[in-house]
From Swiss-Prot:
Compartments (UniProt record): Cytoplasm
Protein name per its UniProtKB record: Small ribosomal subunit protein eS1z
Highest taxon, organism lineage: Eukaryota
Keywords: Cytoplasm, Ribonucleoprotein, Ribosomal protein
Entry's Gene Ontology BP terms: translation
Keyword NAD in annotation: no
Compositional bias of kind Basic residues: 1-18
Gene Ontology molecular function, alphabetical: mRNA binding; structural constituent of ribosome
Species of the source: Arabidopsis thaliana (Mouse-ear cress)
Coiled coil: none
SMART domains, alphabetized: Ribosomal_S3Ae
Keyword Signal: no
Length: 262
């Protein structure tokens, strides 16, 4: 019988088992800050690997995009159907300073708006703000029945739809091109542009549920730290702990009781 190596016998591994390293031990938490146009500026926290060699932590944070509900930013549940996108532009200490980077509707809100017996009208336009941001605005609107109308349906004619769409584009261009990004976002929150469109198209066909449903930023200007700090302001008025004075009755020193037999 030939004597040779038995392949079935497994060789012992060199060295012992490697220690399991917690991946979070090499990471740091940073606070995500929203612009000052929103009521609540503390969006949340984000993780990033610590600075090691040529890999700098702040560089790994820049240009991250966070999606936040407007209800959380404004403290108003009526705005829960709006999603705001914020992009990290700079890191100051442990704060990640973000800029507005888009807006969208939740799917359930859009589905709830679409109904039968009415006409859906949509329009979109590319605009440039005074601070050189190029945006694409998407508008949505629905026809409604006139006062004292008996007929169930409220369908608009093709010529009326074209007129309404033209009005939508004109108003969106006028409102967006006359202000900077900060002021434009302030118009999105209370739906000021939608109300303006609804008022302007009243003579063509009455509309309801007029919204700027989506905003995309196509092109942003070169990064300017001064402008970013103007958008964010200072953080001296943040929600921090304050000293609480004890009431006078609690501060009264209790007299020690005499123990009999001591």
């Amino acid at each position: 019988m030939a004597v040779g190596k038995n392949k079935r016998i497994s060789k012992g591994r060199k060295g012992g088992k490697k220690k399991a390293v917690d991946p979070f031990s090499k990471k740091d938490w940073y606070d995500v800050k929203a612009p000052s146009i929103f009521t609540h500026r503390n969006v949340g926290k984000t993780l990033v690997s610590r600075t090691q060699g040529t890999k700098i932590a702040s560089e790994g944070l820049k240009h991250r995009v966070f999606e936040v509900s407007l209800a959380d930013l404004q403290g108003d549940e009526d705005n829960a159907y709006r999603k705001i996108r914020l992009r990290a532009e700079d890191v100051q200490g442990r704060n990640v300073l973000c800029q507005f980077w888009g807006m969208d509707f939740t799917t359930d809100k859009l589905r709830s708006l679409v109904k039968k017996w009415q006409t859906l009208i949509e329009a979109h336009v590319d605009v440039k703000t005074t601070d050189s941001y190029t945006l694409r605005l998407f508008c949505i609107a629905f026809t409604k029945r006139r006062a004292n109308q008996v007929k169930r349906t409220c369908y608009a004619q093709s010529s009326q739809i074209r007129q309404i769409r033209r009005k939508m584009r004109d108003i969106m261009v006028r409102e967006a091109s006359s202000c900077d990004l900060k002021d434009l976002v302030a118009k999105f929150i209370p739906e000021a542009i939608g109300r303006e469109i609804e008022k302007a198209t009243q003579g063509i066909y009455p509309l309801q549920n007029v919204f700027i449903r989506k905003v995309k930023i196509l092109k942003a200007p070169k990064f300017d730290l001064g402008k970013l700090m103007d958008v964010h302001g200072d953080y001296s008025a943040e929600d921090v702990g304050v000293k609480v004075d004890r009431p006078a009755d609690e501060m009264a020193v209790e007299e020690p009781t005499e123990i009999i037999g001591a």
